[in-house]
Design a protein with these regions (language model features):
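Glycine/small-residue-rich phosphate/adenosyl-binding loop
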Residues: 35, 52-61
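Short beta-strand scaffold segments in enzyme catalytic cores
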Residues: 23-31
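Short helix-loop-beta connector
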Residues: 65-69
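Local cysteine-cluster metal-coordination motifs and their immediate loop/turn environment
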Residues: 73-92
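Zinc-dependent deaminase
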Residues: 1-15, 87-145
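Short beta->alpha transition motifs characteristic of CBS
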Residues: 34-41
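A short, polar/charged loop-to-alpha-helix boundary motif
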Residues: 41-53
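A short helix-loop-beta-strand connector motif used in the catalytic cores of GNAT acetyltransferases and
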Residues: 17-21
Length: 145
């Protein structure tokens, strides 16, 4: 098991327990978690608080050199907005729990030379599959459909 993916899953579960969309993210620098977050669009009535955005916000202000040595983990493939933040800050590695229930613009990350690893983690797949089946309206709103 990957302890950083486990931490992202714990964030996703926290979001689900709070009535939100179960997507979690952690920002890793070296061997330490610098930021954690989960999707809070529902809980906070936000249009931008996806898991990766919440994670980056919770990491606080970091220098460009720090981001360029970081890895961001997400339980789900980053959307266009979150991909843009990853590109903006030059985060060189993205680890994705799963991209079966939603595939963001992974090709944009790869074209920019970012190392993208998709783990196809069954826990992430199950969490999202269940949520989407139970809450299709919330899910469609989250992905802009």
């Amino acid at each position: 098991m990957d302890r950083f993916l486990d931490a992202a899953i714990a964030e996703a579960e926290k979001g689900r327990a709070d009535g939100g969309i179960p997507i979690g993210s952690v920002l890793v620098i070296g061997d330490e978690i610098a930021g954690r977050g989960h999707n809070q669009r529902i809980q906070r009535g936000s249009v931008v608080l996806h898991a990766e955005m919440d994670c980056l916000e919770n990491a606080g202000r970091l220098s460009a050199s720090v981001y360029r040595n970081a890895t961001i983990y997400s339980t789900l493939s980053p959307c266009s907005m979150c991909t843009g933040a990853i590109l903006l800050y030059g985060i060189p590695q993205v680890v994705v729990g799963e991209n079966r229930t939603f595939q963001g613009p992974q090709h944009l990350l790869e074209q920019a030379g970012i190392d993208v690893k998709v783990l196809d983690d069954p826990r992430c797949i199950s969490m999202m599959t269940s949520f989407i089946a139970e809450n299709p309206e919330l899910w469609n709103e989250d992905i802009g459909e």
